[in-house]
Amino acid sequence: PNTKSIDGENTSKDGFFTYVNGFIKEKLSLGGSAAIKITEFSWNKDLYELIQRFEYWTVFCTSVNTSSSEGFLIGVNYLGPYCDRAIVDGNIMHANYIFWRNSTIMALSHNSVLDTPKFKCRCNNALIVNLKEKELNEMVIGLLKKGKLLIRNNGKLLNFGNHLVNVP
């Protein structure tokens, strides 16, 4: 018997992922972190490719519901255009995740991704600075990779407020 109703191929979705990807590219500080929920049928090719532009990234499954395809793409220390690693195609990344998820027997757990020994995220008291693009050098990129530095994007005007209507 079928357990899921599937109406076509399982392809990359846009929807809200367009906004998540835009936020990471345009507003997330260099050195910042992100966690985005994905499932077998709710995923995005570009997001998989973007998450590889973090110094450390993984897909984390909570195992609370072992029959679920839910996972979280975790990215730590965003490098953006300063990432020098090869980027794997997002469709291949998702296929690998689904294969791994469907072939791995998981025991129930409630562990946090931050509790796992291999997770490289530590509290580092990162310094937050404004730097121009021309001021980024190998030393600065090294500090980003180690989580010692956050660089605000001071080239864009960001306007946030708590009002739904702007009144002159």
From Swiss-Prot:
One of its GO terms (molecular function) is mRNA (nucleoside-2'-O-)-methyltransferase activity. Gene3D superfamilies: Vaccinia Virus protein VP39 (3.40.50.150). It is an enzyme of class 2 (transferase). It comes from the Viruses. It comes from Canine coronavirus (strain Insavc-1). InterPro entries: NIV_2_O_MTASE, NSP16_CoV-like, SAM-dependent_MTases_sf. This is Replicase polyprotein 1ab. GO terms for biological process: methylation; viral translational frameshifting. Keywords: Methyltransferase, Transferase. Its EC number is 2.1.1.-. The replicase polyprotein of coronaviruses is a multifunctional protein: it contains the activities necessary for the transcription of negative stranded RNA, leader RNA, subgenomic mRNAs and progeny virion RNA as well as proteinases responsible for the cleavage of the polyprotein into functional products. Residues 1-165 form the Nidovirus-type SAM-dependent 2'-O-MTase domain.
